[in-house]
Amino acid sequence: MTEQKTNRTEEQLEQELRKSKGGKLSGKILSMLGVVIAVAGIILGGNLVLVVIGRVILGLGQMVQGKSKEQSDRQAFDAIAPDIVGTVFENVQMNPDPPLLDANDTNIPLPNHTCCSGSGYIRGTYHGLNTELCTVRLTEVSEFQREETGMWEKNEQVVYTGQWMLSELNREFPTWLTIWPRDKMDKLFRSKTIQTGNEDFDKRFNLSSDDEEVVLRILSPDRMERILALAGSSIGKFAVNLKPDGRLYIAVHSGHGFFDIGKGRENPAQLRERFARELRWFTDMIEVFCGE
């Protein structure tokens, strides 16, 4: 009976994914039409009517695309997420209130932003550890003046979308540490970072703490090798913040959230496999910091 129910759910999801592709295509066509009309209005001496009509159609097209994807994401979440999460966590709570995970509570370096928001919170216990995951989005709001109308408008741009997890390790540490990607500018200007002695690790990551000697005892050679191994299978650049009270924050700049259908090209079985793989990556990182 359970298998029949699962098959029906996945058939419904497959139908929803097909609808999503059609909705996204319609939205793209509307968006392109809106751009063409707006550009034509500008070329024709700043025809305000055409510009406004073009912008309205463009906005409508973007809304259609967004709504279509949102519906498919929800369908995928309802059909797949409970099973995936239930195999990893116990005592699962969907949308716990208030959430434990707060991106502003960490010193993980993030892009400049105006607003930080979290969504899709899920809480459970992983091997007895309170654990919570969510999607974090950062947006930057700016104002600009349109030449063709002279009107000031606000522009809201998403500058970061990532998957985050918080796990309470039920133990204390003598200091804090933060690990984050070492980019080209860091290498060019030789930004200050704690050197671990592991050449591969030092090339790939920055490390900060308020006690260099102690943090190198926490970040043992075995832990560094395990982190490097996980870096090879990561779905994006990631950062880790371990606090003295044992709270471990893991942040992956993947460009999407947990249980996100992406471009809608995967069938339900492929989505299930990817969702499970992404969640397993996070729990593997928790394991790195468990024990001595």
Model-found features: residue ranges?
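Hydrophobic alpha-helical transmembrane segments
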Residues: 42-56
